[in-house]
Curated annotation (Swiss-Prot):
This is Alanine--tRNA ligase. InterPro entries: aa-tRNA-synth_II/BPL/LPL (IPR045864), Ala-tRNA-lgiase_IIc (IPR002318), Ala-tRNA-ligase_IIc_anticod-bd (IPR018162), Ala-tRNA-synth_IIc_core (IPR018165), Ala-tRNA-synth_IIc_N (IPR018164), Ala-tRNA_ligase (IPR050058), Ala_tRNA_ligase_euk/bac (IPR023033), Thr/Ala-tRNA-synth_IIc_edit (IPR018163). Binds 1 zinc ion per subunit. Pfam families: tRNA-synt_2c, tRNA_SAD. The keyword Ligase applies. Catalyzes the attachment of alanine to tRNA(Ala) in a two-step reaction: alanine is first activated by ATP to form Ala-AMP and then transferred to the acceptor end of tRNA(Ala). Also edits incorrectly charged Ser-tRNA(Ala) and Gly-tRNA(Ala) via its editing domain. Belongs to the class-II aminoacyl-tRNA synthetase family. SMART domains: tRNA_SAD (SM00863). The lineage of its organism: Bacteria, Bacillati, Mycoplasmatota, Mycoplasmoidales, Metamycoplasmataceae. It is found in: Cytoplasm. Its EC number is 6.1.1.7.
């Protein structure tokens, strides 16, 4: 067995299967594209789902990938066990109706023994009882009965309850008795252990389950393989755990620079309790920073919702474990660069680091206070914790509920979760995604289609009378639909374009027996038939009339052609290295994602827009050319995998705008650039580090809609600025002229807005100059270890700005300021960098009867009258432990 680097192992995998005529699929982003059933890409096959369901045509019947995936459903085991991770990589080889059991087993055996040079003596195999072909094949490769372990339906049959399913065969590597003195009974009895490591699972998809446990053979049999990358690396590098490899050790070494503690590999065998806890913290940090970095790179921003909550939770769990290693300052952001090197991945290091640093700084401000609150509550309640305290730790101090549970578990303390269910559902939308494959969500009736039975004629024809080739509900083919549920129909000829290549499907109507039924969706099956989704009553053996919504089609064509021109203009502006990472065109707008190592300037985006409008003014005709791959390459045609998935390499359709761009595309397009009328870029925003998304519209109508919206937005901002200025200068006035021309009105109002911003800032500076003098020491009150500044005699204007300024200048002091309002009401503002301002205000409003709100840093409200200072001081003394 040869010791190989992780990057070398990954490349060996890809190269091996390429030699076996497999098409390599690049690792896709962790955030699923157009798949609401998954929170994250959680398996190697998840990105290939549409190929297995027949919704997309694969670029080859043989595929290979190395897909990064993310799971957080068993996060508490990360760092505790040898092999649990949040981010992991799955090596996969797949056959879609091509080779089957014999070849799949041959490939697995050859790769492991010839390429990785693993000793066959160390390999153990499981197989499904009754799968004689698999048993005999492994036996022919030299495996004895002792090495071939019979599995049950529970262990060796992959079945999701409905749809394609079949037996599987697992490959285990025996690392020897130093890891466990017990033998193969560990595999037979499914006992968790570190001796026999499952490194490969081959699923033989050969049956269809109708949902009633009736199994019939599939005509097209598939192979779905998953090999654990981190596990294979640990075996080849002789690491006791997955963490003791070049995937994690460089990250751990970087963490060691921030702490006096060291990670010790040998402790796996020594099991010294204190070092075990130290190693656990190192592993958690090293694991989590990989997931954090890739997720942010793929566009997920830390937040309190959905995917963002999970990333925030990982950051805070990692930061807490840094605290346990004695690290009292932000450090995770420093690990981003080394993560990129270990994964052989390019990141926008600066942007990702900045996002992580900001999260660390925010959590650091509340961590100590929150932990002290937890400790004090445990002392008061004799090691019992109230659900309200757990809620407050999250709501006020940013402690994820799961982190609080872990801290309590380390102290051997349980707490009642029943009162937190509603809170968790609202704030913790955490993935409970099961280990799924791309064989889910199959519309059973569509599996009955065996060939291409329809032609798309919509490039030139917009309406036609035709016949029905196939009619079905979700479960079976029917002669007539009931009109109550979604139904599926294939026509002999159709003018309706199916969603593909970033272009949304056409809209229109089915007309039969004086009944008009709306088309809801159109998608392709694996034979390139256009499947039309509708809800209504139609009969199969009667003709139908199909009518395209031509206005909608024109808008789709404008936006699709606009996307091609945008891509060309971006390449002109930033260079030929600009790639299309994604696009989405519907009837209302278009989006385009592209990579760039910096944020495009406003001038550059304007230049891109102006260039496209010059293409429009040139009135360039669109041409179509059908050719083969070789000729397309000679024409320097721009080709994306998304487009090539739907096309025969011997019959490629090129869309040509002379002297601008030649692109492989199956979509619909305008006949001449002048039909775009006007191209307007609405925004260019960062989608994640190093990836930017342009949103744009085409046509004069959409442009004027955009202008009207922007004008209303600017008028609202002008009104708000005017009101702010009048609070400082009551006599300030502003009259706006009535301009008919929308463009003139927009330009004029934008200038007014900019001028008002400048004027307001000047007024603020002059106001704040008054408050930047030293604080009155007589108004500072010490309560316990906290300092408060109380002043109820300040001017009303800019009181919030004064509070914020003083807080920034004096971060160790909490400010409670007040000013008189009309009708004897009193304004209270709380501003603190170290205590929860909103919690302090909440208690004030509770005692003095009032209303208001705010956030951790600043909060404001009003009460019935000006309070007495002595009452306030008493209030602070009585409630200091709750703030």
């Amino acid at each position: 067995m040869e010791k190989l680097s992780a990057n070398k192992i990954r490349q060996l995998w890809i190269d091996f299967f390429r030699e076996k005529n497999h098409f390599f699929i690049e690792s896709k982003p962790l955030v699923p594209q157009n798949d609401d059933s998954l929170l994250w890409i959680n398996s190697g096959v998840a990105t290939l789902k549409d190929y297995f369901t027949g919704k997309k045509i694969p670029p080859s019947k043989r595929l290979v990938n190395s897909q990064k995936a993310l799971r957080t459903n068993d996060i508490e085991n990360v760092g505790l066990t040898s092999r649990h991770h949040t981010l992991f990589e799955m090596l996969g080889n797949f056959s879609i109706g091509d080779y089957f059991k014999t070849e799949a087993i041959d490939y697995a055996y050859e790769f492991l023994t010839k390429k990785l040079k693993l000793d066959p003596k160390n390999l153990f195999i499981t197989y499904y009882d009754g799968d004689d072909i698999t048993f005999e094949k492994w036996k022919s490769l030299g495996f004895s009965n002792e090495k071939l372990i019979k599995g049950s339906r529970k262990t060796n049959f992959w079945d999701l309850g409905q749809g394609p399913c079949g037996p599987c065969s697992e490959i285990y590597f025996d690392r020897g008795p130093k890891f466990d003195s017990r033998g193969s009974e560990l595999i037979k009895n499914e006992i968790e252990n570190d001796r026999f490591i499952e490194i490969w699972n081959i699923v033989f998809s050969e049956f269809n389950n109708d949902g009633q446990q009736n199994y019939t053979p599939l005509k097209s049999k598939n192979i779905d393989t998953g090999a654990g990358f981190e596990r294979i690396v640990s075996i080849l590098q002789d690491g006791p755990t997955n963490y003791d490899t070049d995937l994690f050790l460089p990250i751990i070494a970087e963490i060691e620079k921030s702490t006096v503690f060291q990670y010790k590999i040998e402790n796996y065998f020594l099991k010294e309790p204190r070092q075990t806890q130290i190693n656990k913290s190192f592993r958690i940090i090293a694991d989590h920073i990989r997931a954090i970095t890739l997720a942010i790179n793929d566009g997920v921003q830390p937040s309190n919702l959905h995917r963002g909550y999970i990333i925030r939770r990982l950051i805070r769990r990692a930061y807490w474990n840094g605290k346990k290693l004695g690290i009292s300052h932000p450090f995770l952001y420093k690990l981003v660069e080394i993560v990129g090197k270990t994964l052989d991945y390019r990141f926008d290091i600066q942007t990702i680091s900045k996002i992580i640093l900001n999260e660390e700084e925010n959590f650091a401000k509340t961590l100590e206070i929150g932990y002290n609150l937890l400790e004090s509550q445990l002392k008061i309640n004799k090691n019992q914790i109230k659900p309200v305290t757990v809620f407050k730790l999250f709501e006020t101090y940013g402690f994820p509920v799961e982190l609080t549970k872990e801290i309590l578990a380390e102290k051997n303390i349980d707490f009642d979760l029943s009162q937190l269910v509603e809170f968790q559902e609202k704030h913790s939308q955490i993935s409970r995604a099961k280990k799924t494959t791309g064989m889910q969500k199959v519309i059973n009736s569509l599996t009955q289609i065996k060939a291409k039975i329809s032609d798309f004629i919509g490039y030139h024809t917009h309406h036609i009378e035709t016949k029905i080739s196939f009619l079905a509900n979700k479960d079976e083919e029917v002669a007539e639909t009931n009109g109550e549920n979604l139904s599926y129909v294939i026509f002999e000829k159709t003018p309706f374009y199916a969603t593909a290549g970033g272009q949304k499907h056409d809209q229109g109507w089915i007309i039969q027996n004086n009944s008009t039924i709306e088309i809801l969706d159109v998608f392709k099956d694996k034979f390139l038939n256009n499947i039309h989704v509708f809800k209504g009553k139609i009969v199969k053996n009667q003709p139908v009339f199909l009518k395209l919504d031509t206005k909608n089609r024109l808008n789709l064509e404008r936006n699709h052609s606009g996307t091609h021109l945008l891509f060309a203009s971006l390449r002109q502006e930033f260079g030929s290295e600009i790639k299309q990472l994604g696009s989405d065109n519907n009837e209302n707008r278009l989006t385009f994602d592209f990579p760039l190592n910096r944020k495009p300037s406003d001038q550059e985006i304007k230049s891109v827009e102006n260039r496209i409008n010059s293409y429009i003014n040139q009135k360039i005709k669109r041409k179509y050319l059908v050719t083969n791959l070789e000729e397309a390459q000679k024409l320097n045609a721009i080709m994306t995998l998304e487009e090539s998935e739907y096309m025969d390499p011997n019959s490629l359709r090129l869309v040509i705008f002379d002297k601008i761009t030649t692109d492989l595309c199956g979509g619909t397009h305008i006949e001449n650039t002048e039909l775009l009328e006007k191209f307007t870029i609405l925004s260019c925003q960062s989608k994640g580090s190093g990836i930017y998304r342009i949103r744009a519209v085409t046509s004069w109508n959409k442009y004027f809609e955009f202008l009207k919206g922007k004008i209303q937005e600017i008028l609202s901002k002008i009104s708000a600025l005017k009101n702010k200025i009048k609070k400082i200068e009551p006599n300030f006035g502003l009259n706006l002229p009535n301009l008919v021309d929308l463009e003139q009105q927009f330009d004029y109002l934008k200038k007014i807005e900019d001028d008002l911003k400048i004027y307001y800032k000047k007024l603020l500076k002059s106001q704040l100059r008054i408050v930047k003098s030293e604080l009155d020491a007589n108004k500072i009150i010490e309560i316990g270890k906290f300092s408060f500044y109380l002043d109820f005699n300040l001017p009303l204007h800019n009181l919030k700005q004064i509070a914020a300024t003083w807080r920034e200048q004096n971060p160790r002091i909490s400010f409670i300021l007040g000013a008189n309002l009309v009708n004897n009401e009193f304004l209270i503002i709380v501003s603190s960098a170290i205590l929860a301002s909103n919690q302090i205000l909440e208690k004030i409003l509770e005692i003095f009867t009032g209303s208001g709100g705010g956030n951790y840093k600043i909060a404001q409200g009003k009460i019935q009258k000006k309070p007495e200072k002595e009452v306030f001081i008493k209030l602070l003394w009585e409630n200091i432990t709750e703030f």
